[in-house]
Amino acid sequence: MTTTPCNMNITIRITRSTITFTAPNTVIEGQTDFEQYNMKSGIAVAANLRQALAECHILKTQTAPERQTSVATSQHHPVFDTATVYVDTPLLLIPAEEYDEEAMPTLYHHVNSQYKDDNVVGTPIPQINVVAAYAVGKDLSFVLTETFRTVQFMPLLAPVLVEFCRHSYGGFQEKLFCYFHDRRIDVCAFRKGRVRFCSAFDVSLTPDAVYYILNVWQTLGMKRTDVLCLAGSITGHEALLKELRRFIKNIRNITI
């Protein structure tokens, strides 16, 4: 069955290594299309995105002639008016009750000085009672607004944090959560539905991952009988478990 495209949304996920596009198929009802672009090293993220948009099969094929006529003078895509864009820059989690929109950029740039030339966006994550502050490159924003009428940014880690918080309930043991992706570990802990700890570490080798996890474990005063939850794409999974089990009794793999 053919659908009538109107104010359709495409989801774009930008990581260190890939750009992915996910969108509803405008011809086959109920079908979702997915496409991945591998980042080219040596060029900026915005340049990679511009190339990915130019090559994206979804954007080329999902067209609506009846709308193209009405938007002939528009620079924006004739079918996908809006884009939800997940970006993977460092997060600064601010308690919702302490959030100050005017102070947010200064606070973020103080902690993440390498992003001082980027815009800072704040996205509420009400499920864990925080506002996530994160950087969005000005060039990246420009490339996106050239193609889409409306662009909504989201932190890549937001849905992961919400899911981890859900898993944190139940039982009397403390839980530490680790999300592996793109040669990085995001490590977080919760207590009574609030963020207790959240940080990210770059890792390329299993010993590095073990070191950072155990360092956080010790810093938080966690016991051998507490619970470590692992998720994501884990390189050297068995070797990692072997080392961690020397110090941590309860290790769980969870799917998010």
Ranges and model annotations:
Residues 1-28:
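N-terminal basic/disordered segments at the start of proteins
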Residues 196-256:
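Accessory, usually C-terminal, subdomains that scaffold auxiliary metal cofactors
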Residues 24, 30-63, 70, 74-166:
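Active-site neighborhood for divalent-cation/phosphate handling
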Residues 7, 80-82, 173, 224-227:
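A general structural motif
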Residues 9, 128-131, 227-229:
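Short active-site oxyanion
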Residues 7-13, 84, 175-179:
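Short glycine-aspartate micro-motif
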Residues 7-9, 51, 55-59, 232, ...:
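RNase H-like, metal-dependent nuclease domains and their acidic two-metal-ion catalytic environment used
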Residues 16-20, 37, 69, 75, ...:
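Small-residue (GG/TT-enriched) beta-loop-alpha framework at ligand/catalytic clefts
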